[in-house]
Structure formats: C-alpha cells, structure tokens
Amino acid sequence: MILEIIIFLLTTLVGYYYWSYKQLHKYFDDRGVKYVPGLPVFGNVFRSTFGKTHSLYDLLDVYKAYPDEKYVGYMEPMLPILLIRDPEIIKNITIKDFDHFTDHRGHFFSEDSDPLFAGSLFLMKGDKWREMRTTLSPAFTTSKMKYMMPFMVENSNNVLEYLNEHQSQDIDVDDLIRRYTNDVIASSGFGLQVNSFKNKENEFFQIGSNIFEFDVRQKIFTVLISQFPSLAKKFGARLFPDKTYNFFREIVLSTMEYRRKEKVERPDMIQLLMEAPRGKKLLLFSEWTAEELISQVFVFFAGGFETIASAIAMTIHELALNPNVQEKLYQEIRNNNEKTELTFENLHELKYLDCVLNETLRKWCPAIIMDRICVKTYELPPPREGGKPCILKPGDVVYNMVNCLQMDPKYFPDPEVYDPDRFSDENKHNIKPFTHLPFGSGPRICIGKSRY
C-alpha cells in the first residue's frame, strides 16, 4: 500500500513538472518569441545550479542563440523570462515606461522570516520602495559622501603598511582586496575600526567572506523554494542563517544606542541613516523600525562587499596584463599627488582613472542583468521585423541584459580587449546609449550612483 502511494505521488509529481515544462514552451510560442528549450525543472540554469559554470554563461548561451532578435525566451525553474537584448527597449522599460516595471522580481522570503534581505530597499515594491528611496536619497549626497573619504584613506594606509612588511613574500591579491574592502565598509558603514591585515580572523571579515558562498546544497534549496514559494514563506525559509542576522542586528542596535545616549556623531552610514528620516513626513512608515534600518545597513554591506572587491581585483588583474595602461594610470596619479594630496574633490580630476574603472565594469561587470517585474499590462514591440508585438501581463519577468551587451562586438568592437580609451572624452560619444549600464538605469539605478 505504501509503495503504491509513493509510486502515485512520484508519477503525479513527474506529470506536473512535465506539464509545467510544456507550459513554458507554450508561453513563448504563443507570443512568437524564440527560445532555447531547457530541461524540465531546471530550465536553462541546470549547469549553474550544480556549479558547472557561472550563471552568466547560461544567460550568454541564450543571448547568443538568436543574435538578430530584440528579445528572447529564457527559462529558470518553472519561470518564463524575457531577455531584453535591444538598448532602446531597455531604455523604455527602465525609464520611459518605468511605471509599468517599478519592481524587482519577487522573492521567496517574507519580511518576518528574513528581514535582513526582504526588508531592504532593493526588494521593496511600489509606493513603499518609492518612499524609502526618497527618504534615503539625502544620505547619499556628495556633501555627505565626502566625509567618508578619510576612512578610505586610513584603510588604504593599512594596505601600504601590509605590503611594505611583506615585500619579499607572495601576496594573494584577491584576499588583499577583500580585506581592504571589508575594512572600508566596516569603517564607513558601521563605525568599526577593523584591521583585517593584523586581525585576519575577525568576525566581520569572516561573515562578509561567507555571506554569498552558496554550495550546491544551498543552490538546490533555492531551486526548491522557487518551486514552492508559499511553503517557503509559511515555514520561514531564509537566505541567511541566524548567526548572520544576529551579528548585524547587534552591531547596528548597539551602535545606535551608544550614539544616542552619549550624543556621539560620526560621518558614517549608520549616522546618515539615523538622520535621514528627520524632518520628513512619512506616509507609509509611521517611523523607522530597527529592523528596517538594520536591513538597509546590511544591504549596504552585502551589496558593496563582493561587487567592490571584484571590481578592484579585476582592475588590478587587467593592469598587470596591460603594462601600458598601468603606466599611464600611474603617471596620472603621480602627477596629481605631486600637486596636492588626494581629496574627495580632486579625485574627480583623475580622468584616466575614471576610464580605467569604466572599462573594468564593462568587461567584468558584477551586475549581470537588471531584473524587472511587469506591474501593468504592457506591449513590447515585435522581437523581429515581421513579428508580432508581445503582450506582458502583471507578474511577467524581464531581464534587461547588462554584461552580455557590454561584451557584444556589435556595440563594443574587440570586446575582449581591455581599452580604457573607449571612455575618454574623445571617444565616449561612440558608445551607444544603454549598452553600458554597470549601475543600472532609471529610477531604480544604484542609489549611490544616482547622486553623481
């Protein structure tokens, strides 16, 4: 009897997944959208789910499959997605018709079970996101950001001291940059003096290093909860363990309590977020809760640690491979330092440094896609000449391509060549709008980038 029940359940489950898999095909076929058939359950992300490749290459395979299409179909586990390949459509989705695509893709974690992630600005939706964004924006003005510059310089000196003490030894550059990034965020974000070069096993660095290190088990878990989102929320599934949540909660709350009690102010992210709501009439928030503030500070850390560390590490990698670029950048920085010490204001005078960073973010962009979820019925133009328009309904998901466009020879000739001069004043007019979007685009652009 038990065996028969098991066989029945397995047969039903297999039948359900096969039917769902065929529905994905039907979704694209009905809309006249070309797609690459994936595998049942996993869609087009089978390889990346099991760690065989990075998710970028799953996207790239589909992106390259139909080079003349403005958008193509992509399958994540039981979810049809449109990959937007056309810069003009990306412009419409992220700016012109933003009111149809105000939100990021829905997630599988409730604010009750995973307040660190679910309660962040990045995942807020609709009016709640709009109000939080308006409230937070003053914290990212140029006048506020420049006060964090001394913290970065101080931590840079720690790097120089470490390098001077280990001149005769091999240096793990990736580890070096991660420790530097960790210390800058700890100081400018949390008001903590953490020297990860002397205290290599400090808890702040350990948690930051492991926060997004998903093993195969965690990836499969993510696939499963994406199949059963209601169960994930019901049973309190969360992306981060209790240890991570409790660590950040304790840091933020204890720091806030100390500063309020002792009337201490420090120009870091916690202070800016504490001050942001002052004098503002909040419509959807009666007041900022501790959980909401903790969530914003956490995302400042999580969103900055990996992306900044990767960008700096890849810049160093490219400078090592391109000594001519390295020498040109070195001379620019040296000439500037001979005139004056580095400040927030004269940092903007380093034009070639800006070109170098832009080229790194083109070739090695941490942001692979800009996801958007349709909130109002919307008509996309035909994917090709002679095709039919595609009607999107509320809940439909689009991925505006970032990395794939930036490595497309159609928009960037010889994309594998590291050439910062693409972004020089003389050449940057050749870059087609909406093909270089490392910080996003439109009202949901990175809040730090939006202030500059």
Predicted regions and their residues:
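Hydrophobic mid-domain F-helix/FG-region of cytochrome P450s
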Residues: 78-91, 118, 157-160, 171-198, ...
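Cytochrome P450 catalytic-core helices
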Residues: 307-332, 450-452
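Cytochrome P450 heme-thiolate "Cys pocket" and heme-binding signature region
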Residues: 118-119, 387-389, 394, 426-452
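Cytochrome P450
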Residues: 1-14, 74-82, 143-154, 164-187, ...
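N-terminal membrane-proximal hinge/A-helix region immediately C-terminal to the signal-anchor transmembrane segment
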Residues: 2-114, 127-131, 151-161, 244, ...
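Conserved cytochrome P450 K-helix/beta-meander segment immediately N-terminal to the heme-binding cysteine loop
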Residues: 400-428
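Conserved cytochrome P450 K-helix E-x-x-R motif and the immediately C-terminal K′/meander segment
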Residues: 46-68, 250, 254, 340-387, ...
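Conserved cytochrome P450 catalytic core segment spanning the I/J/K helices
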Residues: 46-50, 60, 141-143, 168, ...
